[in-house]
Amino acid sequence: MSRRSNTVSRPTKPDPIYRNRLVNMLVNRILKNGKKSLGYRILYTALKTIKQKTKKNPLSVLRQAVRRATPNVVVKARRRGGSTYQVPIEVKPSQGRALAIRWLLSAARKRSGRSMGLKLSYELMDAARQTGNAIRKREETHRMAEANRAFAHFR
């Protein structure tokens, strides 16, 4: 067991334009090779596209998409008596939000198309409408947790 004390998680800073922490969390996950300005450009393009297509506030669409893609439970593999069980575990809100962001971005990257900004905007709009691959991933995770509910006491 570690003797170190638990680290205090630093609050993420809000982004410069929308002054929103969620936007900054999304930008930090978009990054490749540390190019933060490119991450901002991709996300702002996506938000601009959302505003043009839906005529709604893009931040509310983003929040709704993340909220709908956030899982309540996940399954973790636990070894017990020589066999591996998928054990359902409840997720903290911050961890769930991080998973939702990760799933939204991976679903956007898998979409066909040229620019990441457009792919991300379509994935966010789909997630806000309860469709899309990120929502499918969440439902699949919930189904797995429900199927393995009998192993919940293995924690």
Curated annotation (Swiss-Prot):
GO cellular component: chloroplast; small ribosomal subunit
Keywords recorded for this protein, A-Z: Chloroplast, Plastid, Ribonucleoprotein, Ribosomal protein, RNA-binding, rRNA-binding
Database matches in SUPFAM superfamilies: Ribosomal protein S7
An MF annotation (GO) of this entry: structural constituent of ribosome
Record flagged with keyword Transmembrane: no
Subunit text: Part of the 30S ribosomal subunit.
Listed InterPro entries: Ribosomal_uS7, Ribosomal_uS7_bac/org-type, Ribosomal_uS7_CS, Ribosomal_uS7_dom, Ribosomal_uS7_dom_sf
Top-level lineage group: Eukaryota
Function of the protein: One of the primary rRNA binding proteins, it binds directly to 16S rRNA where it nucleates assembly of the head domain of the 30S subunit.
Biological process, per Gene Ontology: translation
Family: Belongs to the universal ribosomal protein uS7 family.
Coiled-coil portions: none
Protein's recorded name: Small ribosomal subunit protein uS7c
Organism taxonomic ancestry: Eukaryota, Viridiplantae, Streptophyta, Zygnematophyceae, Zygnematophycidae
Gene that specifies this protein: rps7
Principal place of residence: plastid
Organism of provenance: Spirogyra maxima (Green alga)
